[in-house]
Amino acid sequence: MLKLFTKLFGTKSERDLKSIRPYVEKINLEYEKLVSLTNDELRKKTDSLKQYIKVETQEFIGELEIRERQLEATTQLTPKEVEDLYIQISRIKEQYNTQLEKVLLDILPQAFAIVKETARRFKENEQLIVTATGYDRELAITEKHIDIEGDQAIWKNQWEVTGHLLTWDMVHYDEQLIGGVILHKGKIAEMATGEGKTLVATLPTFLNALVGKGVHIVTVNEYLAKRDAAWMKPIYQFHGFTVACIEETSPYSAARREAYQADITYGTNNEFGFDYLRDNMASQQEEVVQREHHYAIVDEVDSVLIDDARTPLIISGPVEKGNEQEYITFNPRIKRLYEAQKQIVNQFLQEAKSQMVAGKNDEAGLPLFRAYRGLPKYKPLIKYLSEPGVKQLLHKTENYYIQDNSRMMPEADEPLLFTIDEKHNTVELTEKGLEYITQQGEDPDFFILPDTATAVGEIESDAGLDNLEKEQKKQILAQEYAIKSQRIHAVQQLLKAYALFEKDIDYILVDGKAKIVDEQTGRVLEGRRYSDGLHQAIEAKEEIKIEKASQTYATITLQNYFRLYHKLAGMTGTAETEAGEFYDIYHLDVVVTPTHKPVVREDKDDKVYKTVREKFNAIIEEITVLANQGRPVLVGTTSVEISELVSKMLNLRKIKHQVLNAKHHQKEAEIVAEAGKPGTVTIATNMAGRGTDIKLSPEAKAAGGLAIIGTERHESRRVDRQLRGRAGRQGDVGSSQFFVSLEDSLMRLFISDRIAKIMDSLGLKEGEMIQHSMITRSIERAQKKVEQNNYAYRKRLLEYDNELNKQREIIYRRRRDALLGHRLGAEVNAMLFEVAKSSVMQQGVKANYHVLATKFSYITGTLPPITEEEFHTYDIQKITDIIYQAFLSSYMNRLAVFKEQGIAVQMNLPDHIADIRAEYLSFSFSDSERRLEVPVKIADFMDNAGEAILKSLERVAIIYYLDRYWQEHLRYMDELRHSVQNASYEQKDPLLIYKFESYALFSTMIARANESIITYLLKANLLLYKASDEKPKMVEKNKRIELEESKQDIISLLRERASNSSEEILKPQPIKSQKIANRNERVTVQYEDGTIKENVKFKSVEEDIANGKCILLETR
């Protein structure tokens, strides 16, 4: 059916290209019209397009300005009126963007033609002479390729790029125009190596820069950002666009802010993301560097949106107390445990071998399976599994023990100290293992968490204890629980470090530090640390300095950062295999762009060997033959360890070669430049696959082109395609060949027994191999399975992060409005009402008078304006209005007080205050609990002292308390995500519970922040003031926090934490223990407004519970 559909309507790529080719024809028609124009006339075309865009979108811009003025002008808007205005503004912005995209599509042919004609003129002329503009004169001061002679500007076609003088020699061809259209439409363009992605990006960049809202071009490393910016910027600058690279500026600096104000901004994905987080930690408006996120083009988009999907950007600071000592204390025990397990596994392996030799295959199955469960990567075991019939026996035994929900598995695991599930990358300590690490004389429950529910019940029912003694005992129980929880967590992480993470594969040691190696690229991930204490465990294992634990202050995933953009596009050489994921998660369509010249590279079927030793011997022979033929050879490896192994084997043969891996990355540019010469052998991890272009010498082409040798298949087809793509660029000859053994990880875990049976039946001798298209297809099917599993994990993680992202958007919007001084009156008014409402209501029902009186007195320092009798007589709405009016009256009194104090300060200021260097007056406020420094601009203060003081205090208090509670909330959310994983053991969906609990937690956090802000505003007193030429930071007096930026790998929490069945974290208040019922059970629920529904079926309210609209009280 699919074949018939394809035959009738063509492939997706054919249909995509059919819709794009008309644009190419229009672009070329416009291009022909431009040839006769002078250089000045060509430049004026750009100005006319800018003007056209303004005219066509002016209606919506005018409406937006009216709505914004309404928000700014009115301070007494109700929360409902503010929300309505936000909705109107959002709707107008959507209409504006729709109109804008329509206009841009209309002028696309003209804009693309201008870029192409500019490129042609630079290629065919050594210099372009134009009438000098002010911008030309400004550029000529710093740019060597621009000269000013009288009223003329002379643009040369040579300029410096990363230290080398480059002569422009490129003009866009039709396939690149196709790529440009794809990128402008907000899609992903898959373009083969050497097809000129950097040049393609100039087309949509130019078109979208006409809008004036900024275009961000995102690269995967600093070198590419600087190179591409320097390489392409003269094309843009010639037409009056400003171009900057954020990598050439410092964070927080005025230069960084100016870089974002440029029409076109280059930078790395990490730096764009970190700047967003820094902006949302800024204490002054001048510290904010980014502006609206309008349009971004992401280079190597699959690397950013898929490979880095589990990697959040984090800004963190120190915590008061770390747990480094736990890892130091228990490391020797886990090391002994791991060595003891090795001996046990070796004994089971020898037993299995003996039974097999004796022909007792049935008896050999269990010890073989136990060895596999104990240490699946144990090299003697892997070697033995390549023997005829052994792997089939292992799978047969495994199937027996996993049947009936793994009912028999405890019997198989009983002699082991810990078990490893290699497919899910988890490890779990057994009861025997717990006994092993518990030392003599220690409490037998030293590593077992207490049953708190039972213990609390016993304390409550103990009639011999008074209330104070009960509280003391419960406090001791909670402390014991926390200590044991931390201890067990350290042991679990140490066990993972020993059992699941290998040096020179997962990480390397450099200068006494453990640095993570990216499995996709082979590069060192500078600044990234494994999360949840795992990195500290690895440091303890390697006996290097254990870095201190840190607290998260701000975090965002790259995926959620790029979702901020109105329009997002991407480029890569390998996206088609992940097209489904791009569309499902990011709504990005993948379009394959045709190559300029046909690809003539020969991709050979995989060569499959029985053992790793035979495979590597064959690889060395192949390299020798190819190098002797004068062909350059690129050997792709999956880890640092394998690259060094191949290097040693080549040294024994005295074959000259270069090694490019995470340990030798400094020489990357130099090694790649030499890799295309005849007979050159280059060994590289996957890091040679991106951002590099191996150009062949004429002699190398004549010898047969670049030969790619893959030492094993990667889990991802994309990585293999990246490696193949190094050869055959721009129609060059070349070849690719993968060598595989049955001992490779992918083959062991995911290839069916069928291939092993075939090889056994063929009776292959030492060094012989099989090579067939059927085998290659079977391997690719296995890769698809792994990709599907990884996609499921990434999607699940994204679903968790989406909950936090919704909360982040709310907090950051409120914080940004406060920082910029937008709608402060409306914001404070809304908080006054919410705090009044929460003072009257508790858990959705009317509070008692004592609670109301206590809270009102704490917030205002006065008695409530309502008696207990009135409280019981009036309804909730009336009481709320009374309390709100009292809060509002108190707030207006503060304004009057500050006005009087401000006038007094004004009278004491020197007459020449406006002439001195100071820009701010710094006021100190205190509510007897906390002291804040509040900067007030002198100009605002002199104009209206009281209002200037109050507005500045509002801004400082809102930002201070939002930051304080948000940072605390981030820690709670991380602990929540950890703790809900145990719900899977109760057949409950952890994500559903996480959504419900996180909503309750966020609501409580917002309520606490609002109350703290209002309390401070109503109680804080002015202490002193001073003139200052610096903008004070909004932190507590004498408190300065050193921040650090990092990328932490959350390593698929669902996978990593699945092994922690015995581990449970005490959830911080106010998380409520949420019950979950069966769908047909009768339940009682309470809604936010206090309404209680009794005896309803759980399935009828399940959605409301998931959305946080109600809470489950009991089941029947």
From Swiss-Prot:
Q: Where do transmembrane segments lie in this chain?
A: none
Q: Where in the cell is it found?
A: Cell inner membrane; Cytoplasm
User: Which leading EC class covers this enzyme?
Assistant: translocase
UniProt xrefs under PROSITE patterns: SECA, SECA_MOTOR_DEAD
The record's GO CC annotations read: cell envelope Sec protein transport complex; cytosol; plasma membrane
Pfam families noted in UniProt: P-loop_SecA, SecA_DEAD, SecA_PP_bind, SecA_SW
Classification via CDD domains = DEXDc_SecA (cd17928), SF2_C_secA (cd18803)
The keyword Hydrolase belongs to this UniProt entry's keyword annotation? no
Catalysed transformations (reactions):
ATP + H2O + cellular proteinSide 1 = ADP + phosphate + cellular proteinSide 2
Q: Which GO terms describe its molecular function?
A: ATP binding; protein-exporting ATPase activity
| EC id | 7.4.2.8
Q: Which family does it belong to?
A: Belongs to the SecA family.
What's the stated role of this polypeptide?
Part of the Sec protein translocase complex. Interacts with the SecYEG preprotein conducting channel. Has a central role in coupling the hydrolysis of ATP to the transfer of proteins into and across the cell membrane, serving as an ATP-driven molecular motor driving the stepwise translocation of polypeptide chains across the membrane.
Q: Can you name this protein?
A: Protein translocase subunit SecA
This protein's species is: Amoebophilus asiaticus (strain 5a2)
